[in-house]
Amino acid sequence: MLMTRPNLKGRSFLAEKDFTQEELLYFLDLAAELKEKKKNGIPHHYLEGKNVALLFEKTSTRTRCAFTVACTDLGANPEYLGKSDIQLGKKESVEDTAKVLGRMFDGIEFRGFNHETVESLAQNSGVPVWNGLTDMWHPTQTLADLLTIREHVGKLKNVKLVYVGDGRNNVANSLLVGGAIVGMDVRICTPETLWPAQEVIDLAKKYNEQVMITSNVEEAVANADVIYTDVWVSMGEEEKFAERVKLLKPYQVNMKMIKETGNENVIFLHCLPAFHDVETMYGEEVYEKYGLKEMEVTDEVFRSKHSKVFDQAENRMHTIKAVMAATLGNME
């Protein structure tokens, strides 16, 4: 059952902080409805005849696939523009690029590095712009996370979510602020040198004073409903690998940590890709250099009943579809 529909037509989706609790929950309700329609083969062409630009400065599997399928399901035409196709800030300014794309497309997705780039696209294009990831925020991921949590835990309010790992990255920032907005008990567990920026902590505390930032694993995971982790090194930070392995090894999600929650129904989430074995070239390289067969999560946890990572990956598509439909679609 959809809650009262807020008017989001024409809005850009750049960060969770730009939306109220009611608006974020509406995105989740709409995503659940669209997920059900897709499952039952019910057409939902809310973007019939629209053209959508998909700008990718950073490579992607899930984000690109999710936006492409979401566009197609909604009746829109997606146009992929990769790193070699766009000249943002090189041969053409972001402002000029935004103005050109806004004349040709009805909506723009951007996945890249600087958050200022997606803000400039939104400011200058005249069409809704959706953030597929920047160094600061990853809001489409957080919506998928929240939908997955609601499906498996049954609610969001007062749910204890523990993010373990690099607390300064975009996923941690978005979970901290987005989770606080919807009333969750968010805990970031990481070494002090990797705590979120103070401005992000302060922003989260505006919505929920209960947020916890700690380096103590036992304290963080006690009674947790959700354990969440991400890669130890983000794209563009590869030179920090040895340092991060040393820092974050005690924060690996393993069965000992799962048991320390005291909750046999605790769920495990990861935005993927996850380094839980040596079945990739990257995994082999890490094993050769550092002797680690598993990194941020053990294979045992990744493949266990606790793991909901593939539901979470699928939900990227449904939540992205909801964001595009609500901000660009004909929802009457």
Curated annotation (Swiss-Prot):
Family annotation (Pfam families): OTCace, OTCace_N
GO CC annotation terms, alphabetical: cytoplasm
Record function comment: Reversibly catalyzes the transfer of the carbamoyl group from carbamoyl phosphate (CP) to the N(epsilon) atom of ornithine (ORN) to produce L-citrulline.
Main location: cytoplasm
Keywords from the UniProt entry: Arginine metabolism, Cytoplasm, Transferase
Protein's UniProt keywords contain NAD: no
Residues reported to bind L-ornithine: N170, D230, S234, M235
Gene3D superfamilies: Aspartate/ornithine carbamoyltransferase
Binding sites annotated in the UniProt record for carbamoyl phosphate: S60, T61, R62, T63, Q87, R111, H138, P139, T140, Q141, C271, L272, R316
The name this protein goes by in its record: Ornithine carbamoyltransferase, catabolic
Native source species: Bacillus cereus (strain ATCC 10987 / NRS 248)
Taxonomic lineage from the root: Bacteria, Bacillati, Bacillota, Bacilli, Bacillales
Pathway: Amino-acid degradation; L-arginine degradation via ADI pathway; carbamoyl phosphate from L-arginine: step 2/2
EC number: 2.1.3.3
GO terms classed as biological process: arginine biosynthetic process via ornithine; arginine catabolic process to ornithine; citrulline biosynthetic process; L-arginine biosynthetic process
Top enzyme class: transferase
Catalytic activity: carbamoyl phosphate + L-ornithine = L-citrulline + phosphate + H(+)
GO MF terms held by the record: amino acid binding; ornithine carbamoyltransferase activity
